[in-house]
C-alpha cells in the first residue's frame, strides 16, 4: 500500500526534486507532454529521487482536440507511464475522457471555457470510471483578473459536483521549476478556502491512491480490478 502525499508537476531535475522533498512532499508525479515524451528523462528523475529517498513516478499529459487522436494516444502510452492525464476543455474530450478507465486524470476541464466544463452526468462518469478531476493551482496563479475569478468559480463548481457524486479530485502545483513548487500546506490551505477541511485532506491524499491503484494493476497476476490469478 503506497502512502504519503504526492505533488503533480513538471519537475525532472535533481535540484527540483530535492526542493519538493524539502517542502514536505513524500513523492511526485513528474508529467511530460506527450509530444515530448522521453523515457530517459523520466528514468533520470526517478534516479534523482532514489538518491534522496524520494518517490518519483512517471506521468504523461495528452493534449489534443481530436477524439480519435486522443484515444490512439491513450492506447500508445498507457503502459509506458504510471499516470495518464488528458487536457480537457473541449466538452467532447471531457466526456470521452471520463468514460475511459484507462485515463487517470481529466486535466483542466474548464480550460478556455465560459463554464466549468462538467455537469452532473460527467461527474457521475468520472466516479464510475475512477477518473479524477484536476485543479491546477499553477494555472490559477498565472491567470489574471477576470480569468482568475472564472477559474476559481470553476474549481468551486467542480468540487461541489465531485463531492456530491464521489468523483476523485486532485490538486496539482503544475510547477515547471523550483519557483512554482508549493508546500503541501499551501495547497491544502487554499483548498480550505473553497471547501471543507476534511474534503481538502481527501483531495491532497488522492494522487498517491491513484498511483497505488495503477501499480496494483501492473502486477503480473492482476487481470483487472478485483480479479487476480492465484497459484
From Swiss-Prot:
Annotated GO MF terms: ribonuclease P activity
Any one GO CC term of the record: ribonuclease P complex
Main location (coarse class): cytoplasm
UniProt superkingdom: Archaea
SUPFAM superfamilies assigned to the protein according to its UniProt record, in alphabetical order: PHP domain-like
Catalytic reaction list: Endonucleolytic cleavage of RNA, removing 5'-extranucleotides from tRNA precursor
EC code(s) of this entry: 3.1.26.5
One of the GO BP terms on file: tRNA 5'-leader removal
Keyword terms of this UniProt record: Cytoplasm, Endonuclease, Hydrolase, Nuclease, tRNA processing
Compartments it resides in: Cytoplasm
Pfam families, per the entry: RNase_P_p30
Subunit structure, interactors included: Consists of a catalytic RNA component and at least 4-5 protein subunits.
Known role: Part of ribonuclease P, a protein complex that generates mature tRNA molecules by cleaving their 5'-ends.
Family annotation (HAMAP family): RNase_P_3
Family classification: Belongs to the eukaryotic/archaeal RNase P protein component 3 family.
Protein name (record): Ribonuclease P protein component 3
Gene behind the chain: rnp3
Amino acid at each position: 500500500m503506497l502512502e504519503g502525499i504526492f505533488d503533480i508537476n513538471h519537475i525532472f531535475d535533481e535540484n527540483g526534486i530535492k526542493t519538493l522533498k524539502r517542502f514536505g512532499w513524500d513523492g511526485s508525479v513528474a508529467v511530460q507532454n506527450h509530444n515530448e515524451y522521453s523515457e530517459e528523462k523520466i528514468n533520470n528523475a526517478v534516479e534523482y529521487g532514489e538518491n534522496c529517498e524520494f518517490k518519483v513516478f512517471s506521468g504523461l499529459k495528452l493534449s489534443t482536440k481530436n477524439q480519435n487522436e486522443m484515444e490512439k494516444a491513450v492506447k500508445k502510452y498507457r503502459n509506458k507511464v504510471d499516470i495518464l492525464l488528458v487536457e480537457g476543455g473541449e466538452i467532447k474530450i471531457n466526456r470521452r475522457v471520463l468514460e475511459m478507465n484507462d485515463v487517470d486524470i481529466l486535466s483542466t476541464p474548464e480550460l478556455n471555457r465560459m463554464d466549468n466544463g462538467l455537469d452532473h452526468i460527467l461527474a457521475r462518469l468520472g466516479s464510475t470510471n475512477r477518473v479524477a478531476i484536476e485543479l491546477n493551482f499553477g494555472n490559477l496563479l498565472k491567470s489574471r483578473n477576470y480569468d482568475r475569478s472564472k477559474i476559481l468559480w470553476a474549481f468551486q463548481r467542480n468540487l461541489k459536483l465531485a463531492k456530491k457524486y464521489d468523483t476523485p479530485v486532485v490538486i496539482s502545483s503544475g510547477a515547471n521549476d523550483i519557483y512554482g513548487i508549493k508546500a503541501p500546506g499551501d495547497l491544502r490551505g487554499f483548498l480550505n478556502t473553497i471547501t471543507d477541511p476534511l474534503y481538502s485532506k481527501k483531495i491532497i491524499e488522492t494522487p498517491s491512491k491513484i498511483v497505488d491503484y495503477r501499480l496494483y494493476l501492473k502486477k503480473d497476476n492482476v487481470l483487472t480490478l478485483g480479479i487476480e490469478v492465484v497459484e
